[in-house]
């Protein structure tokens, strides 16, 4: 069968490539054409447009690049029409993808399947109308999305979470502490891991407070998980003259050797939980308490970390915006390092999260459902 996929950013490229690999096993004659990236291209098929030429986030960047944005929309529509796939598969990236869903469904009558739901449970809930109209099947990777969509009388399939898959096959899963510190020239002291984000603005806002708070725990060494694409020189402006180390491309290995972690919100909070490392979730943004109150008003959820969202209760402490202070981080870090009951309680919460996430196999489960559904038409 013929498959057209659209992924508009790096994470989508990764998830779509895994899905393509699984689709080939279900359908050895699969033909692919796609908007995506290098990982998708490595699975075979035709790359029509690289996501690096599409990644305009926010009102101003879109406005400044409106000609390119409109060109990409026209190109995608005409290419889908010419290829006329058996199914259009969309991966997150809702601003662009919901336009394509409408076009494929209303103009071409092509089945539309969505892998990885847009986060409409957090903001822009009005997008549910377009999803109900134009998306035939939604494959979710977050279990709490099921009741959200049920509330809107729309049935979705939870297929598992890709992070569980990544954890299950990660290398060095049995690595010893001595081996890790020797390879990375670290001290023979327990580790507090610092995961300060993936973008320079995030790191600049979060890392200094993380270092200040964690430095109080002198029996521990501080180790930063360096983000991909960020140079060591950038980090050195924050750690120069301080007893802080950094490792690159070893985040999972660092976490599993750590006694605790300070983590910015995002997938990293879930990865830390799956590896059973106690954590404090930290996130700084401009605007202080006013921005925080506005942020909480706009968001439709009680929590920002995936761990707490999946558990539907507070498992990990979230120190956001004006609550993210050196003193608050020190207090919470002290609890998860030195209070056995607190550590035990958090690990029990992690176990409940892991139970709700289920077993590995998210892309494989989605691929089976896609192929079976299209063949049944």
Report each predicted region and the residues it spans.
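Nucleotide-activated sugar donor-binding and catalytic core shared by glycosyltransferases
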Residues: 1-377
């Amino acid at each position: 069968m013929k498959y057209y996929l659209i992924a508009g950013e790096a994470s989508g490229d990764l998830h779509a490539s895994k899905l393509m690999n699984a689709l080939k096993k279900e359908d050895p004659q699969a033909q692919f054409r796609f908007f995506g990236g290098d990982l998708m291209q490595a699975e075979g098929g035709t790359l029509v447009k690289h996501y690096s030429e599409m990644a305009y986030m926010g009102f101003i960047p879109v406005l400044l690049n409106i000609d390119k944005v409109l060109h990409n929309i026209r190109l995608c529509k005409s290419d889908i029409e010419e290829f006329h796939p058996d199914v259009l598969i969309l991966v997150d990236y809702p601003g662009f993808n919901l336009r394509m869903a409408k076009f494929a469904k209303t103009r071409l009558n092509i089945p539309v399947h969505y892998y990885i739901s847009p986060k409409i449970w957090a903001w822009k809930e009005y997008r549910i109308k377009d999803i109900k109209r134009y998306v035939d099947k939604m494959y979710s990777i977050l279990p709490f999305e099921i009741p959200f969509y049920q509330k809107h009388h729309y049935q979705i399939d939870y297929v598992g979470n890709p992070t569980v898959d990544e954890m299950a096959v990660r290398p060095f899963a049995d690595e010893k502490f001595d081996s890790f510190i020797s390879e990375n020239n670290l001290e023979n002291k327990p580790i507090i891991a610092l995961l300060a984000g993936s973008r320079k603005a995030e790191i600049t806002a979060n890392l200094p407070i993380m270092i200040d708070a964690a430095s109080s725990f002198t029996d521990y060494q501080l180790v930063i998980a360096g983000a991909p694409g960020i140079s060591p020189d950038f980090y050195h402006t924050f750690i120069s003259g301080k007893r802080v180390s950094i490792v690159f491309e070893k985040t999972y290995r660092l976490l599993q050797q750590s006694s605790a972690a300070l983590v910015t919100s995002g997938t990293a909070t879930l990865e830390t939980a799956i590896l059973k490392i106690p954590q404090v979730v930290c996130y700084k943004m401009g605007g202080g308490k006013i921005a925080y109150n506005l942020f909480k008003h706009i968001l439709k959820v009680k929590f920002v970390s995936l761990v707490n969202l999946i558990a539907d209760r507070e498992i990990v402490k979230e120190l956001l915006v004006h609550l993210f202070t050196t003193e608050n981080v020190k207090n919470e870090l002290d609890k998860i390092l030195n209070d056995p009951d607190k550590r035990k309680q958090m690990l029990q919460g992690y176990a409940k999260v892991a139970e709700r996430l289920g077993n590995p196999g998210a892309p494989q489960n989605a691929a089976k459902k896609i192929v079976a559904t299209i063949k049944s038409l």
